[in-house]
Structure formats: structure tokens, C-alpha cells
């Protein structure tokens, strides 16, 4: 969220993301995107992340029971084998969001600055492509 101040970008607003952690392997990831919700299972080495929310301009950092209920019901539609007894916790974070990702070069005091922010809830999805573009922009001569 620091881009609001660092880059003087008033367009940056939080997209509140809430997730649940479960010690159960779904085998593969599951994804479904609808307005205001991002339903997914992302297997990691230690847990599977169940998500999630994308509540734009919501600064709330508390885990909300109603969001957990929504996440679980949507995940169970994609992954009926989910075992709720294996839930071990959850988290909330604020993802910088804007109308479109800011991925560009700006020169500040004759120094090249590459901006790459505003992905909102699509950070995981866009990370590889954006990282490649950042590398290209950095390697281009001034």
C-alpha cells in the first residue's frame, strides 16, 4: 500500500484478501473467479491456501467469520473432499489495487525506477509475466 505515498498515486486502494490454511493436499490447484471473490486452492509444501476475498477499498485486518464461511462454501463447490477438521488458521492482507497494474519506467532525479504494483488479488497469477517485463525494462539502456 506504500505506493500511495511513495509514488503519490491516489488511485491505489487496498483489496482486502482473506485466506484459510488447511493441512490437506488437493492434488492440484483449483480456481474460479467471480466478482468480489477469488475462489482457489493453492497447494504449498506445508499447507494448502484456500481463498479468498478481494474486497476493494476495505482496510479491515481482522479475520471475519462470514468471509470464512463464504470461502469454505465456495471452495467445497470446487473441492468436495475438503476436510474442515484439518483447518489450522487463516490470514488477512491488503493487496495494492488500482484500475490497471502500473508496470513502467519513470526517471526520478536521473535514476531509472521501474514501477510494478497494483495487481490486487491477481498477484500470483500475474507474477511471472510481470517479473519478466520488469527484467526487460531494467536491462534496457537509459
Model regions: which residues?
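C-terminal catalytic lobe of FAD-dependent flavoproteins
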Residues: 82-142
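Active-site substrate-recognition segment that forms the wall
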Residues: 1-109
Amino acid at each position: 500500500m506504500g505506493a500511495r505515498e511513495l509514488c503519490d498515486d491516489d488511485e491505489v486502494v487496498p483489496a482486502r484478501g482473506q485466506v484459510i490454511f488447511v493441512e490437506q493436499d488437493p492434488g492440484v490447484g483449483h480456481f474460479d473467479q467471480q466478482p468480489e471473490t477469488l475462489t482457489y486452492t493453492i497447494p504449498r509444501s506445508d499447507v494448502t491456501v484456500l481463498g479468498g476475498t478481494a474486497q476493494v477499498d476495505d482496510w479491515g485486518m481482522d479475520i471475519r467469520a462470514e468471509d470464512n464461511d463464504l470461502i469454505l462454501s465456495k471452495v467445497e463447490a470446487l473441492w468436495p473432499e475438503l476436510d474442515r477438521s484439518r483447518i489450522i488458521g487463516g490470514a488477512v492482507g491488503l493487496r495494492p489495487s488500482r484500475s490497471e497494474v502500473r508496470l513502467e519506467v519513470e526517471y526520478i532525479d536521473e535514476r531509472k525506477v521501474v514501477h510494478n504494483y497494483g495487481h490486487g488479488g491477481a498477484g500470483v497469477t500475474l507474477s511471472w509475466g510481470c517479473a519478466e517485463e520488469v527484467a526487460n525494462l531494467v536491462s534496457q539502456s537509459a
